[in-house]
């Protein structure tokens, strides 16, 4: 690979499974599939000088991705941690009609096919019809470069972008009780890249339970 284009990084996950790391020189990064967060951190603590990428992680099948924050938290602690690639992006299913004539998304086993991998083609964070699964909410929040936190009536906006400020964004803060919006504020706040700003919230307190 390097002889064809020496400017590009080489990724080869297979060498990480060879004992004694004797072929580590082949790849420019450490890369593993489905390593536990503590295993990833163990490598990062060694500070070998090579970045770490999870080339496949967080098998997004069914009600999953609950532990994603254990990985994204490492981004704040270790510069060498470069994230990973969720398996996978979208479900593989076929739109068809069931016996009642209703349109459904069918997959392994729905066509009396044997052998079959059954639901193992439905591992996506997006459904086959391109609608978002609930897992997208978790992923979007943790992957966001803009973080907001509230403490003692003060709102802190952190901009983790490398270059872009927040000048083109609108921020919305809502006060809800039992799902009912009591008050909502929309405001602008220009936070330069890599910086944070804190402002006082104008939302009133709720004295009753709920």
Give residue ranges: language-model regions.
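Extended substrate-binding grooves/exosites of carbohydrate-active enzymes
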Residues: 1-154, 161-167, 172-181
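Intrinsically disordered, low-complexity Pro/Gly/Ser/Thr-rich segments with frequent PxxP/GP/PP motifs
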Residues: 169-209
């Amino acid at each position: 690979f390097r002889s064809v284009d020496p400017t590009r990084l080489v990724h080869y996950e297979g060498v990480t499974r060879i004992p004694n790391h004797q072929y580590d020189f082949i790849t420019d990064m450490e890369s593993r599939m489905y390593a536990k967060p503590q295993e990833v951190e163990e490598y990062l603590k060694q500070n070998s000088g090579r970045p770490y990428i999870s080339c496949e992680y967080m098998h997004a099948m069914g009600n999953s991705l609950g532990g994603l924050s254990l990985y994204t938290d490492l981004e704040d602690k270790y510069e060498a941690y470069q994230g990973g690639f969720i398996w996978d992006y979208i479900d593989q299913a076929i739109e068809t009609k069931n016996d009642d004539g209703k349109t459904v998304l069918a997959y392994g086993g729905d066509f009396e096919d044997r052998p079959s991998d059954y639901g193992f083609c439905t591992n996506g964070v997006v459904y086959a019809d391109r609608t978002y699964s609930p897992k997208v909410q978790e992923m979007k929040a943790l992957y966001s470069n803009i973080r907001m936190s509230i403490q003692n009536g003060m709102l802190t906006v952190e901009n983790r972008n490398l270059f872009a400020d927040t000048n083109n964004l609108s921020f919305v803060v809502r006060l809800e009780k039992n799902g009912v919006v009591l008050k909502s504020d929309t405001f602008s706040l220009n936070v330069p890249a890599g910086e944070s700003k804190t402002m006082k919230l104008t939302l009133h307190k709720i004295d009753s339970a709920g």
